[in-house]
Amino acid sequence: MKPKLSARSFVMLNEFLAELVGTCVLLMFGCGCVAQAVLSGGANGGMLSINIGWGLGVLVGVLIAGPVSGKQWSSKLNQYSPFVGAHLNPAVSLSLACVRKFPLTSLAHYLAGQYLGAFLGSSI
């Protein structure tokens, strides 16, 4: 008999994968532009390209992770849903959990996705 995922398990898996991919993309953009500037000796990039690269990394990471684990626009209610997501940083998730703005039940899979995504993004 094939085990079935519950609705909560499916949501947790989606949030985990969203944080993993979003953090991975953030680190790929950021570390990639720093490596380009450093390895070229400043000929192919400087402080401006590094800052733009990190900014684009945050933008793309939030665009990837936000719709899955973040605030979504609800056309029926004409308001944002109350879910918080697209942290892309373990310090953000942990500090929000400490001030009780983020559920402790979601903290483990958010942190796991962020750490694994950061490892993969910096490795690539």
PLM feature spans:
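Membrane-interface helix-loop junctions and terminal tails of multi-pass membrane proteins
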Residues: 1-124
